[in-house]
Amino acid sequence: MADNQVPKRHCQYPLLALLNTPDQPIPHHVPTTPQKQSRARRRLENELESTAQTSNHTAPQTPWAVTTTGTSVTITTRTKDGTQVVVTLHL
């Protein structure tokens, strides 16, 4: 078999070539985790409702449309050039 020919098993199983690839070097910089907020706490539903009732803040008009169906949330918007973007999150 000549050096420029690929062995038959590599044609049939191309992923076998990955066995001969060198290991990736370990990155020198490891990202750090963000610091937790010391005052953050989980709010109960009734606290959220009372806050919403007493707040005079009105939400600004946004170009986003949010739709929920069962266990999914869909967000729809349009870019400045008119392209529609739809993101669906399945919970």
From Swiss-Prot:
Q: What ranges does the record list as Polar residues composition bias?
A: 49-61
Q: Where does this chain mainly localize? A: host cell
Does the keyword section mention Plastid?
Answer: no
Q: What else is known?
A: The major E4 form is first synthesized as an E1^E4 fusion protein from spliced E1^E4 transcripts, such that the first few amino acids of the E4 protein are derived from the N terminus of E1.
Subunit comment for this entry? Assembles into oligomeric complexes. Interacts with host CDK1. Interacts with host SRPK1; this interaction may favor expression of late viral transcripts. Interacts with host cytokeratin components KRT8 and KRT18.
The protein, known as: Protein E4
Q: Which UniProt keywords apply?
A: Early protein, Host cytoplasm, Host G2/M cell cycle arrest by virus, Host nucleus, Host-virus interaction, Modulation of host cell cycle by virus, Phosphoprotein
List the GO biological process terms: symbiont-mediated arrest of host cell cycle during G2/M transition
